[in-house]
Amino acid sequence: MIKRIALMGSGSLGTTLGAFLSKAGHNITLVDANKEHVDALNKTGARIIGAIDETIPVKACYADAMEGSFDLFLYMAKQTANDVAMPQMVKHSHEKSIVVTCQNGLPEPEIAKYVPKERIMGCPIAWGGIFQGPGCTYLTAPPDQMFCTLGTYTGEHTTELDEVAAILQDGNKVTLSGNLMGLRWCKLTLNACFSSLSTITGFTFGEIIDRPEMMRIICYLGRECIRVCEASGISMEPYHFAEREYHFTKLYDFPGDDAPIAEAIAAAEEYLRPAGGKTLASMLQDIQHGRASEVDAIPGAVVDAALQAGVKVPVMIQIWDMIHRIEKGEMTYKPENAFLLALR
């Protein structure tokens, strides 16, 4: 039975989810390395603005101040922090502790270096947030538009899966699946397309949707993701959102240069704008704050998988390289960057 929960990595999403679970009565501790943020959370609570305006009392601590063991870890640290955060988590786990990774990219293989596969679950999240400062985050989606999917790394449907789902249900709506890697590739497709383009242009997801020329680029990036996923032997799951399913494989699997721009815009208007229209890529937020971004865990994950599968991804490689250059200060993010991409 799950009694103690630790949420590792209390950024924009972690603060919101942790606050909602705290409000629902769960014994959860928000863990973070940002001292000012932890102090603000403990002193004044989690301030959530944007889609709602509420301050929720929470319990928070620094990673090196964790005490005892926890039954459930909601792992929301950036992949760039794994080398530090994972050993800290393992130190406070026991033989039955469950780890639910809500990270971007394809994080489970890395988590499995520290935790047995049968204790790992994955939870791609379908809502966004923007960190505002110590103790405060901007929620881009109203609570009734907050969704996530959940599955075990082994693909089994266990009693623990149901228990974790019941807990997460108090923070956002949960859809269960026996195809976690298919879920991961669905979310990775979304992030590698929209987050990457947001990072090089500075546009929010909604501003990308507003521009047909940007959505044409999204179509090309999405097609490359689909081809890599298929070549890797993975069946991509539909995107579960607003109690409906959206099939990226059908949308972005187009021949030649005939990108389905109108269809892509219509689908994004329906499934993405309600919850993510105001979202700004987390990679861009990291760059703006002088932090290392997850460029190698998002577009880089597609590039790595493409190399292993023998699939060409020329557009993804270009945007991945561009983000690296922006991160190094060799370029600045601006809308004009999108037109430097050669679509083929």
Predicted feature descriptions by range:
Residues 2-4, 71, 146:
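Nucleotide donor/acceptor-binding cores
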Residues 27-28, 47, 173, 235, ...:
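Residue-level detector of anion-binding/catalytic polar loops
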